[in-house]
Amino acid sequence: MGWKIWKVWVEGDECQSVLRIIAQSFDEAIAEARKVDVRYNMAQVEGDYTYATYN
């Protein structure tokens, strides 16, 4: 897998702060976002309309 820009956010947060993180995988993007706030659990590749949730 190559490097991608991931949009990461907190599920259900009405005032969403979206982070953009460069990472190779969903897990790496979530791990980096959780250095800012442990609640980050949703991510999608920039320009892609599918997303994944980390439970």
Model features per residue range: what roles?
Residues 1-17:
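Short aromatic-glycine-(Arg/Gly/Cys) micro-motifs in beta-strand/loop hairpins
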Residues 7, 23-24, 52-55:
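Serine/threonine-rich, low-complexity intrinsically disordered segments
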Residues 14-27:
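A short, exposed loop/beta-hairpin motif centered on an aromatic-Gly-Thr core
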Residues 25-29, 39-42:
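Short, low-complexity, polar/charged sequence segments that are solvent-exposed and flexible
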Residues 35-55:
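Short, mixed-charge low-complexity intrinsically disordered segments
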